[in-house]
Amino acid sequence: MPRVKRGVTARARHQKIFALAKGYRGRRKNVYRVAKQAVMKAGQYAYRDRRQRKRQFRQLWIVRINAGARENGLSYSKFMNGLKRASIEIDRKVLADLAVFDKAAFAQLVEKAKSALAA
């Protein structure tokens, strides 16, 4: 059985890591050991932050809805309760967009929520 020298496969493996580490600073971009660690850590951050992004956007939407609702004299929780009682099913992403870019439409929704709470 012939001896296997791994020059080709090792080079391919190294090139794959260096391609992923492209744009990094210092030795992280051109020293294999350091680049491999940096790529692994970047992957961990990416995995974690894909989940955090969903939470952070929901928080942002809630903050924007709360600000818009308070401009119209209602707290976030009462506004959402009023929408539920009025059988208005608009998700938070759209509500936040309305609160920022279409204040008149959002004000109408707040009025409907108020009337549903009063009834």
Swiss-Prot record:
One of its GO terms (biological process) is ribosomal large subunit assembly. Pfam families: Ribosomal_L20 (PF00453). InterPro entries: Ribosomal_bL20, RIBOSOMAL_L20_CS, Ribosomal_protein_bL20_C. Disulfide bonds: none annotated. The keyword Ribonucleoprotein applies. Keywords: Ribonucleoprotein, Ribosomal protein, RNA-binding, rRNA-binding. GO terms for molecular function: rRNA binding; structural constituent of ribosome. CDD domains: Ribosomal_L20 (cd07026). One of its GO terms (cellular component) is ribosome. It comes from the Bacteria. HAMAP family: Ribosomal_bL20. PANTHER family: 39S RIBOSOMAL PROTEIN L20. Belongs to the bacterial ribosomal protein bL20 family. Binds directly to 23S ribosomal RNA and is necessary for the in vitro assembly process of the 50S ribosomal subunit. It is not involved in the protein synthesizing functions of that subunit. This is Large ribosomal subunit protein bL20. The gene is rplT.
